[in-house]
């Protein structure tokens, strides 16, 4: 399967502390259990599912942060879904098709492109970074920095990780006269395994991490 780095939602205003508390309870398996005495007193603690339901209900989705247009709200999303409809061989009624896709975020039209990677995985949202590509970069940035990608992080840790990757990438780019890769969105026209190819992966991930981290989002390491 390999590593996919999935950006997490960020807490709604006023939910910041509770967001972190629930995250730590769930990820560290510290969900409180009712004792026998608690049960006698009628005291109940929320279950894991109840905590997750509360956690997700109080998030701002990453699609909003990358400013992805939404079907049923934005004109460009309507034009996009209409084109998809016109491409169908078997067409249901247009009204039915639009209703089925109401609320869909069109990530490929997102205005904040640093949050939409070019290194993606099949079957995942377009803003999920295929972290497995970083495995090819051990020889240029070191095993510790690569392995850190496999750790789920909240926003501050995500931003810090991105900044450290960026600093290493900048150093390598300066030494090899490859600074142009920092602002190049698409992969370089070079063979896989070259320093150019590897450095572009590192730059792309660093920018992705910095974008989400500075905007209050962490990421889930899914592997």
Spell out what each predicted region is:
Residues 1-211, 215, 222-223:
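Acidic (Asp/Glu-rich) sequence patches and key acidic residues
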């Amino acid at each position: 399967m390999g590593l996919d780095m999935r950006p997490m939602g960020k807490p709604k205003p006023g939910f910041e502390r509770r967001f972190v508390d629930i995250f730590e309870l769930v990820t560290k398996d510290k969900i409180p259990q009712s004792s026998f005495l608690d049960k006698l007193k009628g005291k109940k603690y929320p279950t894991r599912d109840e905590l997750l339901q509360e956690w997700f209900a109080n998030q701002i989705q990453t699609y909003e942060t990358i400013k992805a247009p939404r079907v049923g709200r934005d004109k460009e999303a309507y034009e996009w879904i209409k084109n998809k409809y016109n491409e169908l061989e078997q067409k249901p009624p247009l009204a039915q098709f639009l209703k089925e896709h109401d609320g869909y975020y069109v990530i490929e039209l997102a205005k904040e492109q640093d949050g939409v990677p070019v290194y993606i995985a099949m079957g995942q949202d377009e803003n999920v970074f295929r972290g497995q590509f970083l495995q090819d970069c051990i020889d240029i940035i070191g095993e510790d920095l690569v392995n850190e990608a496999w750790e789920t992080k909240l926003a501050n840790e995500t931003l810090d990780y991105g900044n450290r990757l960026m600093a290493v990438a900048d150093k390598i780019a300066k030494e090899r006269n490859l600074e142009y890769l920092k602002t190049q969105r698409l992969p370089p026209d070079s063979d896989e395994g070259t320093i150019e190819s590897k450095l572009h992966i590192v730059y792309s991930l660093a920018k992705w991490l910095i974008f989400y981290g500075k905007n209050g989002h962490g990421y889930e390491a899914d592997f």
